[in-house]
Regions:
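Glycan-recognition and catalytic cores of secretory/periplasmic carbohydrate-active enzymes
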Residues: 1-149
Length: 149
């Protein structure tokens, strides 16, 4: 990956979604191949995403890097449009990687935003449910939970 993630063909733009979907793809590769290099790389990139996009005071990812000065405000995207939002995808990724402490903080923050933006956050709702099921010790993956016989 040449040590840097880019948005599309741009060498300068990058968003949390770029990280979130790459991490998701690496998690899927690990699930299919059981090759730990994919899981290790997903954890490394997740840590980078936490450093670049995660706002500690709000326990949520902002859309653009924290250090960028190209906009007048720090956008936080929690709504789904044509693709799931980056915060919901990162919550799913953190759970899949076993980064439960980070996932718990993000889950609680997204849960607070739900009261304001319920209609725009279907992926966040599914991500929070997924986190809560795994956190409770259930055997789940991104397709759902298995019932014990």
């Amino acid at each position: 990956i040449n040590d840097k993630i880019y948005h599309s063909y741009s060498k300068e733009l990058v968003f949390i979604e770029d990280y979130a979907f790459l991490i998701n793809a690496l998690n899927d590769l690990y699930d299919k191949t059981m090759n730990f290099k994919y899981k290790d790389l997903a954890k490394k990139i997740s840590s980078e995403a936490l450093n670049i996009f995660y706002i500690q005071e709000k326990n949520i990812f902002q859309k653009n890097p924290k250090g960028s000065n190209d906009v007048f405000f720090n956008p936080i995207d929690i709504g789904d449009n044509t693709i799931p939002n980056g915060n919901a995808m990162m919550l799913i990724n953190l759970v899949r990687l076993g980064m439960i402490k980070e996932a718990k903080k993000l889950s609680e923050s997204l849960n607070g935003y739900l009261n304001i933006y319920k209609n725009h956050m279907m992926t966040s709702l599914r991500a929070i449910d997924y986190f809560n099921e795994v956190y409770a010790g259930k055997n789940c993956n991104e397709e759902g939970c298995k019932l014990d016989d």
